[in-house]
Each structure stands twice: as structure tokens, then as C-alpha cells.
Curated annotation (Swiss-Prot):
Residues 101-110 have a biased composition (Polar residues). During the asexual blood stage, involved in merozoite egress from host erythrocytes possibly via its interaction with the host cytoskeleton protein spectrin resulting in the destabilization of the host cytoskeleton and thus leading to erythrocyte cell membrane rupture. Involved in the binding to host erythrocytes and is required for host erythrocyte invasion. Forms a complex composed of subunits p83, p30, p38, and p42 which remain non-covalently associated; the complex is formed at the merozoite surface prior to egress from host erythrocytes. Forms a complex composed of processed MSP1 subunits, MSP6 subunit p36 and MSP7; the complex is formed at the merozoite surface prior to egress from host erythrocytes. Within the complex, interacts (via subunit p38) with MSP6 subunit p36 and (via subunits p83, p30 and p38) with MSP7 (via subunit p22). Forms a complex composed of MSP1, MSP6, DBLMSP1 and DBLMSP2. Residues 1-19 form the signal peptide. Glycans are attached at N109, N248. Residues 63-126 are annotated as: Disordered. The p190 precursor is cleaved by SUB1 prior to merozoite egress into 4 subunits p83, p30, p38, and p42 which remain non-covalently associated. SUB1-mediated proteolytic cleavage occurs in an orderly manner; the first cleavage occurs at the p30/p38 site, followed by cleavage at the p83/p30 site, the last cleavage occurs at the p38/p42 site. The order of cleavage is essential for parasite viability. SUB1-mediated processing is essential for merozoite egress. This is Merozoite surface protein 1. It is found in: Cell membrane; Secreted. Residues 63-100, 111-120 have a biased composition (Low complexity). Keywords: Cell membrane, EGF-like domain, Glycoprotein, GPI-anchor, Lipoprotein, Malaria, Membrane, Merozoite, Repeat, Secreted, Signal.
Length: 281
């Protein structure tokens, strides 16, 4: 009886362990597939071809904003003048309609004026609305993944997308974009290594696109474990510092040569001035 009870408890433990492992395996695969799609979409969106914002749209929006402000100030001045003329002179329909027409005509011209078409040769330039829609949809998808530290950077990028000048800074600088793609790629590599550890010894089947091949194992280790060993990193940093110092030495030498040359020129000019002064005396 005790043996049967022991066997039942042992079987229950094995089944429960397999269920937990299967659930974690399924979650890992789902996360990895979503991350893989996000990484590929990000690279095709930002790095396959450079985003080019229509420059004429930026200048047109800036000009329309300035003309709108001047139109409002002109309208307020004209309405004040018409109010004064209405109080001093006779009131009538002819005293109000010209001012109202003069107030409405400039506004209609500035607001209804369409932006000029983009240059036909600049075929890569896209409108702000189109690029903003694509980038915002991608950032909202990233936020739904809920990977570690997945809120601050996408929220910051979404804030930049709200303004055309901030959006131009975002796509021209590429600092935030590169940081986001790096984090996504790093997290994908980390979960991929975890999945291969979970499915070690053929315990579970790894999807073909998520398997770690022998030729990429070293690269993945460098990526996950901090780009090689700390000693190699220190050697690289020392080499970079030496190159930096050498460049600075050459720069300092060139600056000293310029200083010496300028001193000689100043001394020669002083001597020439002194000789001319002596001749005049």
C-alpha cells in the first residue's frame, strides 16, 4: 500500500513538473516570436531605408503658424479700430461689413492655402502624418510587449512624435531609435538563450528560427555576457585611450606650431613698426 501511494505521488510530481515546464516553454516561445517580429519590423522601418521628412511641410507649417499669429494680431487691431470708428461716427451696415471682410479674408487665405507639392526628384520624402502614424503604431506595439524597462524610452519617443520638429530630431538623430533596437535585440538574445537552456537534452522542441547554431554561439555569449570577458574589454578600452592620446598629441603639436608661427609673425610686425618709427624720427 505504501509503495502504491509513493508511486502515485511520484507520478503526480512528474506530471505537475512537466505541466509547469510546458507552460513556461509556451510563454517563452510566444515572447520570443513577438520580440522577433518587433526586431525585424524595427530594422525594416528604421534601418532598411532612411526616413526622410518632407522639409517643405516643416517650413510651410512654421510659416502658417507665423501668419496665423500675425492675422490674429491684425484682426484684433482692425476690430479695435472699427469699434472706435463706430462710436465716433454714424453706425450702419457699411461701417461693419468692410472690417469683417478684411478680418476673414486673410484667415481664409492662410488656412486654406495647401502646402506646395514635394520635389519630384526627392521621392524618398514622406509626409509627417504618414511617418508619425507608422512610428507611433510601432511604439505602441513595443509597449504591449512589456519587456523590462519598456515604458520610459517608448513614452519619450511618443512625446517627440507629437511635434513635427521633435519628430525630425528623432529620425535625424537616431539615438533613441538605436537604443530601442539594441534593447530589443539584447532581450531577444537573452530569452533565446533561456529557451535553449530549458530545452536542453531534447527535453522540448525548439522552433527552427529560435535555435542557436554552433557558429553563432560565441557571438551570443559575447552579447549576453557583456561583450566578451572583462579583461578583453579593458584591453580594448586601453587601446582606445592610447589612440585618443596619440591623436591629442598630434593635435597639440599642430596647435603649438600655429602659436609659434603667429608669435613670429607678431614679432616681425613689431620690428617692422619700430624700424618705420625710427626712420620717421
Amino acid at each position: 500500500m505504501k509503495i502504491i501511494f509513493f508511486l502515485c505521488s511520484f507520478l503526480f510530481f512528474i506530471i505537475n513538473t512537466q505541466c509547469v515546464t510546458h507552460e513556461s516553454y509556451q510563454e517563452l516561445v510566444k515572447k520570443l516570436e513577438a520580440l522577433e517580429d518587433a526586431v525585424l519590423t524595427g530594422y525594416s522601418l528604421f534601418q532598411k531605408e532612411k526616413m526622410v521628412l518632407n522639409e517643405e511641410e516643416i517650413t510651410t507649417k512654421g510659416a502658417s503658424a507665423q501668419s496665423g499669429a500675425s492675422a490674429q494680431s491684425g484682426a484684433s487691431a482692425q476690430s479695435g479700430a472699427s469699434a472706435q470708428s463706430g462710436t465716433s461716427g454714424p453706425s450702419g451696415p457699411s461701417g461693419t461689413s468692410p472690417s469683417s471682410r478684411s478680418n476673414t479674408l486673410p484667415r481664409s487665405n492662410t488656412s486654406s492655402g495647401a502646402s506646395p507639392p514635394a520635389d519630384a526628384s526627392d521621392s524618398d520624402a514622406k509626409s509627417y502624418a504618414d511617418l508619425k502614424h507608422r512610428v507611433r503604431n510601432y511604439l505602441f506595439t513595443i509597449k504591449q510587449l512589456k519587456y523590462p524597462e519598456s515604458l520610459d524610452l517608448p513614452n519619450h519617443m511618443l512625446t517627440l512624435c507629437d511635434n513635427i520638429h521633435g519628430f525630425k530630431y528623432l529620425i535625424d538623430g537616431y539615438e533613441e531609435i538605436n537604443e530601442l533596437l539594441y534593447k530589443l535585440n539584447f532581450y531577444f538574445s537573452l530569452l533565446r538563450a533561456k529557451l535553449n537552456d530549458v530545452c536542453a537534452n531534447d527535453y522540448c522542441q525548439i522552433p527552427f528560427n529560435l535555435k542557436i547554431r554552433a557558429n553563432e554561439l560565441d557571438v551570443l555569449k559575447k552579447l549576453v555576457f557583456g561583450y566578451r570577458k572583462p579583461l578583453d574589454n579593458i584591453k580594448d578600452n586601453v587601446g582606445k585611450m592610447e589612440d585618443y592620446i596619440k591623436k591629442n598629441k598630434t593635435t597639440i603639436a599642430n596647435i603649438n606650431e600655429l602659436i609659434e608661427g603667429s608669435k613670429k609673425t607678431i614679432d616681425q610686425n613689431k620690428n617692422a613698426d619700430n624700424e618705420e618709427g625710427k626712420k620717421k624720427i
